[in-house]
Design a protein with these regions (language model features):
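Structured-RNA-binding interfaces characteristic of tRNA pseudouridine synthases
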Residues: 37, 48-143
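Active-site-flanking beta-strand signature of metal-NTP-handling nucleotidyl enzymes
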Residues: 3-9, 112-116
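Glycine/small-residue-rich interface belts in oligomeric ring/scaffold proteins
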Residues: 3, 12, 17-65, 70
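Detector for methionine-enriched segments
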Residues: 1, 29-32, 88, 116
Length: 143
């Protein structure tokens, strides 16, 4: 059994697909592709699928990843890409498939790029130059 890491972009309309819906998309696409994926051994078997560091709803990404276990000892990455990409919804593009070297929890860094209008530069500079920033936490009962 091999763990495969699928790298993909999630842009445009796909940025509004929630994590739970994204899991459903990948489950359906893996089933439709007939790739040799591993199913759990419980009463209701399902595909072993795990997403690493998912973004919030509405955020675009150029490098998301998920892991899926396969029944094979080795994989053909291009075969997987060719089988999955035509089934993906608009806005999700598979960029790379490779055997997972480390576990999802061992991923140490991520790079983020935030773009904002030029009119926000003054407010951003003021925030960055402030000695501290106060945040009011709101709970179900108020503040």
């Amino acid at each position: 059994m091999t763990t495969v890491r699928i790298f993909f972009e999630k842009c445009g309309e796909a940025a509004y697909i929630s994590l739970l819906d994204l899991q459903r998309v990948f489950h359906r696409m893996l089933k439709m592709s007939s790739l040799p994926v591993y199913y759990t051994q419980g009463f209701n078997p399902h595909i072993y699928l795990s997403f690493s560091c998912p973004l919030s709803l509405g955020q675009e990404s150029l490098c998301e990843s998920c892991e899926v276990k396969t029944e094979q000892e080795s994989i053909e990455p291009q075969r997987w890409i060719d089988a999955l990409q035509p089934l993906m919804p608009r806005g999700i593009v598979i960029t790379k498939i490779a055997p997972a070297v480390e576990k999802v929890g061992e991923i140490e860094t991520a790079a983020y790029e935030i773009t904002m209008p030029a009119s926000s530069a003054i407010a951003l500079d003021a925030y960055n130059n402030a000695e501290h920033a106060e945040v009011t936490k709101k709970t179900k009962r108020g503040q």
